[in-house]
């Protein structure tokens, strides 16, 4: 009897067909903990699902990872849907995941928390980046659904409070998968529109799924990058979205946003009237003060006789000139006396004064002064400086210790 043997590839392919055609393995939900999580450069993620006793290798391809509302992490409990099949080349069976959500905590809530933490670390919520809302805007952009109650509330409140402001509606989708790109694009357009002073972005309340576009990163980036100040007005008072944290001002509802974006024209008029009255009173008070000051000046003696003031100043100037001249003469006399005394002191220590008393100064040929008889020799030529000239002399005798030393004496 001849035994028919299968190749490794054939047996793996056969097992794979069995798995694919199995009604349970072809569409199965598995709950477990993520382990050995790896995000490949291709966008695929590879991980292991495990519990206390077992584990299964798993993969989720890029086309499915792009639909995730949160970022899977090591140790996270998840509920995955997919199918079991064999990786023929390695002979290993794998769980091919096409849907994943966080177990216990909703996937949307987890995604919300993750994005909030990420943007907060990047400074998106920092107050130093918040732009000031203009006090009285002229042009207001409204980014919302053109058919919802929010747009009617916003326009109604703005027109009631400040009728002359211009409102520009940028219609967008406010829920669904296409809403986030629609909102982000509208923010870009209102910045390109030109002349917009402030924008309101919002919608009425709803579930977390309905409000989710305002939790998308693309919307947060558009709001953060906007040069036009943004007021967010999403949902009800208790609803906080990522857009609320990034926006320059958060309003709990669209109606409140409309109230905050413009002042009440009646209050503005009252305020202007109050300022007008205050300005008039201040001007009257200032004019009265200046009038009194002018009256005092006009009653002044010199104002009535201006030439007398000139004469008085001239007389005062003459007195000052006399005092100045006298002081200069006194100083000159003092300095002259000082110079004379210093000159006398200088003359007293001058060599010339020594000469005038009959003394002389002797030097050898080198110009060295002769201070003692030990500095000269017999027959040495020396120069003697007198008060009125010099003498060239030859030493013929040296008197030492009261004795005359002659040429024959040593």
UniProtKB/Swiss-Prot annotation:
It is found in: Cytoplasm. It comes from the Bacteria. One of its GO terms (cellular component) is exodeoxyribonuclease VII complex. Its EC number is 3.1.11.6. Keywords: Cytoplasm, Exonuclease, Hydrolase, Nuclease. GO terms for molecular function: exodeoxyribonuclease VII activity; nucleic acid binding. It catalyses: Exonucleolytic cleavage in either 5'- to 3'- or 3'- to 5'-direction to yield nucleoside 5'-phosphates. GO terms for biological process: DNA catabolic process. Belongs to the XseA family. Bidirectionally degrades single-stranded DNA into large acid-insoluble oligonucleotides, which are then degraded further into small acid-soluble oligonucleotides. HAMAP family: Exonuc_7_L (MF_00378). Heterooligomer composed of large and small subunits. This is Exodeoxyribonuclease 7 large subunit. The lineage of its organism: Bacteria, Bacillati, Bacillota, Clostridia, Peptostreptococcales.
């Amino acid at each position: 009897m001849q035994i028919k043997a299968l190749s490794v590839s054939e047996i793996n392919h056969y097992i794979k067909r069995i798995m694919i055609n199995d009604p349970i393995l072809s569409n199965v939900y598995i709950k477990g903990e993520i382990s050995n999580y790896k995000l490949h450069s291709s966008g695929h993620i590879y991980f292991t699902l495990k519990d206390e006793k077992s584990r299964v290798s798993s993969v989720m391809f890029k086309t499915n990872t792009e639909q995730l509302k949160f970022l899977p992490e090591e140790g996270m409990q998840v509920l995955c849907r997919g199918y079991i099949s064999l990786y023929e080349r390695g002979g290993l069976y794998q769980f091919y995941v096409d849907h994943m959500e966080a177990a216990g905590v909703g996937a949307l809530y987890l995604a919300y928390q993750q994005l909030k933490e990420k943007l907060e670390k990047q400074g998106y919520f920092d107050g130093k980046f918040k732009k000031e809302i203009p006090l009285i805007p002229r042009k207001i952009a409204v980014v919302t659904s053109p058919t919802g109650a929010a747009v009617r509330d916003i326009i109604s409140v703005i027109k009631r409070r400040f009728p002359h402001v211009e409102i520009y509606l940028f219609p967008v989708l406010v829920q669904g998968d296409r809403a986030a790109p629609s909102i982000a694009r509208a923010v870009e357009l209102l910045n390109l529109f030109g002349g917009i002073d402030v924008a309101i972005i919002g919608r009425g309340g709803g579930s977390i799924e309905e409000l989710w576009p305002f939790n998308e990163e693309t919307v947060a980036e558009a709001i953060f990058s906007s040069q036009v100040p943004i007021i967010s007005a999403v949902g009800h008072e208790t609803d906080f979205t990522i857009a609320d944290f990034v926006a320059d001002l958060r309003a709990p509802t669209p109606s409140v946003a409309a109230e905050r974006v413009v002042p009440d024209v009646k209050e503005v008029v009252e305020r202007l009237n109050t300022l007008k009255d205050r300005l008039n009173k201040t001007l009257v008070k200032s004019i009265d003060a200046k009038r009194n000051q002018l009256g005092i000046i006009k009653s002044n003696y010199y104002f009535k006789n201006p030439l007398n003031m000139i004469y008085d100043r001239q007389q005062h100037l003459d007195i000052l000139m006399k005092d100045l001249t006298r002081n200069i003469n006194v100083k000159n006399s003092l300095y002259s006396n000082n110079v004379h005394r210093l000159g006398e002191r200088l003359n007293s220590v001058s060599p010339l004064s020594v000469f005038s008393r009959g003394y002389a100064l002797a030097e050898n040929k080198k110009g060295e002064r002769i201070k003692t008889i030990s500095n000269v020799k017999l027959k040495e030529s020396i120069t003697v400086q007198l008060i009125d000239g010099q003498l060239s002399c030859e030493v013929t005798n040296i008197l030492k210790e009261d004795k005359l030393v002659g040429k024959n004496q040593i």
